[in-house]
Amino acid sequence: TDFSTLVSNYDTDVFTPVFERLSELSGKTYTGTVPEGGHRDHLSEQEQIDVAFRVIGDHLRTVSFSIADGIEPGNKERNSVVRNILRRAIRFGRILGFSAEKPLLATLFPVLAEEMGDAFPELQSKQSRILEVLEAEEDQFNRTLDRGLKLVDEADSKLEEGGAFPGEMVVKLWETFGFPIDMTYLLLDERSLRIDRKEVDRLVAIHKGT
């Protein structure tokens, strides 16, 4: 989903309480800006903030419902999809100042449960388990994210002027640390670093034996 485009759902009562709480926690304000043409290259600071609000609000809801339905973050099939969605929300939380010392999703979830609990009572009946999973996953991935950010910065510092980021490092982050490749691409885009995505695909195929 492209959260740089305008989606009217984000102006509904479903997201308003979550956005208000997110604003209180982060000190940032959601203004509903949409990047011109829907492009996410070279976003202004406010555009980055607004995209982060939309990603977090949507992903919190998706992950919470999945856990309530018994599909928890994991390494297999649907579980892996849930984990990647959760991790993407955590990554965008960094834009708003959240970190291992300032967790995000478990703090926001009670607002979602209160807002949607009447229509979806499982959000309240399974609140303890949902919070437990969110807290554990966020703690684990924040540590992974910190390591990944450090490695990206170290590799960046060794690049020649205008040089491409090494595809081997992207694969290492994924293979060794479980760092999603699309998230590494996001970090590189933020730093205006080039990467040969076809080379990464080739290396991943070798790793998988395909």
Map each language-model feature to its residues.
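A glycine- and charged-residue-rich anion-binding loop/surface
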Residues: 1-210
